[in-house]
């Protein structure tokens, strides 16, 4: 099976690569159109700011390539946010608009931002991405912006208020947490995605 990690220029690719390799796959890091489109599974990782990430995707001519994907795609952390319509970061950043939902800054409710550390995730019953993962399992988060709960939400988390921890629209999946840093639950989620 061809597993590709998209070289977005704004992610710690080695941790995702290692986590995938632990499941017996040999992922390829690439931004070449023919390799990406031939992938059976595609990872879209991202860290940092939405503006820097979108600039990198534009510069590397990856925006239309991502939108053309028909295989399962998993956005991780900022990679999930990039699937949205618009980030409220700085003066507003247009995103990939695969999921028609804006990504606002989280309200602090007296809690520290960024939201950093372990938190419980509550998936929709029966969702295949969370198969074999208990309701309320802990996952590791680092973020200050979050997609509100919306029609494409497949898992929620609460940090002062509910927000989208995972999303799905057609073949596009996204997780706000870092499965590669989330122990057994994260490993199971990656396994579920890889075996779809």
Curated annotation (Swiss-Prot):
One of its GO terms (molecular function) is glutaminase activity. Residues 2-196 form the Glutamine amidotransferase type-1 domain. GO terms for biological process: L-histidine biosynthetic process. Its EC number is 4.3.2.10, 3.5.1.2. Keywords: Amino-acid biosynthesis, Cytoplasm, Glutamine amidotransferase, Histidine biosynthesis, Hydrolase, Lyase. Heterodimer of HisH and HisF. This is Imidazole glycerol phosphate synthase subunit HisH. It comes from Salmonella typhimurium (strain LT2 / SGSC1412 / ATCC 700720). The gene is hisH.
